[in-house]
Amino acid sequence: MKGIKNYLTAVLITCTGLSAFAQDHIYSQFFNAPAYLNPALTGQFEGDIRLNMIYRNQWSGLSGDLSYLSASADLNIPKFGGGVGLLFTRSSEGTAYLRKNNIAANYAYSVGGEDLVLSFGIQAGFTNRQIDWGKLVFSDQIDMRLGYVPGSASSAQVPDFSSKFYFDAAGGVNLVYRNFMAGAAVHHINKPDESFTGTQAKLPMRLTANASFRIPLSSYYGYGQEDDGPYLIPSVVYYKQANVNSVSAGAQFKYRNLNTGLWYRSSGQGSPDAIVVSFIFDIFTNRENGEKLRLGISHDATTSKINYTNTSGTTEASIGFEKYFPNSSGYNKFNGLRCYHFY
């Protein structure tokens, strides 16, 4: 009976997603997906090149697949005051295998000095949206006592198209002032049409605002000096898409190579959604050459009406790598704190 219940829950989620507007996924480890969070964070790190990848397996207890992946590569080009990069994002949702693949180019330009850096970023790319209509379950295929009846036929007529391409654009701004960072971004500025049927279904803009503050816990701390900590870094991220709002708020404790975090996230209407625990490990493979490998793991304990017993929560894993190029001068136009120092 539990299996039938979970299956019907998965079907409901899929059908809801098709009948309403498509809502973007959000990462609990937003700090390990900078290119996805805000294009203005492109090139905002200490080395010459940065690679990031993050995978989210949402509500693994349900039979329908809800998984998301983002991979990015960006270059820090301080002599030109900015950075360039590429971002690939893939999502797979529900038993109907509703999939999105997006590839986008990012560019960011920064102005300022040692104490203050203001960055502006733009993003432009293309998305392919696909669905397998044969995997959908319609109402006339569900028995009130037995649930879904495998092999049963439906009289529902499905659209002729199962794939859609569209252009997508975003922009953002980010400010770093001493131990404070704040940013904002707007995604889907052009509100692309995602419809498979010809009936217009525009993707609403996603608004994101984030802020972090770096609090040194050591009496030996001096601004602008390299220090392994310890630090407390409280952060908040606000998301809004159409009439759905969400807030992630919490703090990270960072000491040397270990970063632990505890977060609270609200659901679309402001009610509790999840408690998130994260662990980040920085492995410096070659400090002199700026080589750093970052490994991250987090788990969301669902607190909403779709409870933890049914969903088994959500798990994210991330990996990042950054380094200087051979024979790099290590020249950095901005010698103060960068976005990297806030996560």
Predicted regions and their residues:
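Sec/Tat signal peptide C-region and signal peptidase I cleavage site
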Residues: L18-A22
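Outer-membrane beta-barrel translocator/channel fold
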Residues: Q23-Y36, A40-L41, R56-Q58, L62-D65, ...
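Bacterial N-terminal signal peptides
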Residues: T9-G17
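Detector for outer-membrane/organellar transmembrane beta-barrel domains
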Residues: A170-P192, Q200-R256, W263-R265
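Transmembrane beta-strand segments of Gram-negative outer membrane beta-barrel proteins
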Residues: G43-Y55, V84-L86, P234
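Transmembrane beta-strand segments of outer-membrane beta-barrel domains in Gram-negative
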Residues: L51, G64-S67, Q141-H187, D193-T199, ...
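Bacterial N-terminal signal peptides that target proteins for export
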Residues: M1-L8
